[in-house]
Amino acid sequence: MYKALNPWAIGVKVPIEQCVELAKKNGFEGIYFDVRWAAQVGPAKAKETLAGLKPAAFGLPFNYSCETSDFTEKVLELGKLAAAAEAIGCTRSSTWVPSWHEEMPYDENFMFHRRRIQWIGEALREHGISFGMEFLGPKTLRDGHKYEFIHTMSEMLRLCYETGTGNLGLLLDCWHWYTSGGTLDDVKALKPEQVVDVHVNDAPPGIPLDQQKDNVRALPGETGVIDVRGFLEALESIGYKGPVMAEPFSKRLSEMPPDQAVAVTAKAIESVWP
């Protein structure tokens, strides 16, 4: 596995060229990118811009819960965008899955996701790209909603298995692993191909597990509430070879100058690196 920079996740909003420069300066091996940018500029220019950094992964470029007519159109476009990602050597894409719904009960929502994710998985598979889905662990995200949905690792793995395209796995975020009550043994039981993408961060101290709020986090290693090093060691032990990025939702970080924000993030990841 390797350290990758996601500039948007730490509030850095500068051109990709500057992001690449900051990533290389601070020891990152890869960078997350906008797949539409890669398609627009073409593979030669994209590779030149990345300057040797690995193209870590790209987020699914549309909301898969859209209207059926829009979804069909967007999946067709996804094939073209995936070809652009393939051309620069990217093999990973990911998105998050809401842990609630106001209209669909669990089983109905599960079938909806199976159908939609099958289309997405097949479109990406044509270009050698794996698709990671993030379950959301916090109970506070489900509170106040009519129906609960997937919010644990085992449930998400079931969706991957039952959808059956062969290229589906987890976007495994240690925050959601922690808030869902996950254990290191759960991580150690995974196969490397079941993990597509990895996010790390920490949680504020003194807050019960079922009261942790999704958008109140910390940099990895900042508080020690989450055993981030143990989490990464478990991933290393199963042979995970993909990117690891920080997603701290930190107001303090987002208010820093870009060069400082990237440097602080790199130092935080290094502090928990196996």
Regions found by a protein language model. Give the residues of each.
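Histidine-acidic metal/acid-base catalytic patches
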Residues: 1-27, 44, 51, 83-84, ...
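Short, basic/glycine-rich phosphate-binding loops at helix/coil junctions
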Residues: 55-59, 137, 211
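Glycine-rich, proline-tolerant flexible connector loops at the mouths of alpha/beta enzymes
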Residues: 32-51, 101, 105
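Conserved beta-strand positions in the central sheet of alpha/beta enzyme cores
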Residues: 32, 57-59, 94, 132, ...
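Active-site acidic/histidine proton-transfer and metal-coordination neighborhood
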Residues: 67-169, 179, 256, 260, ...
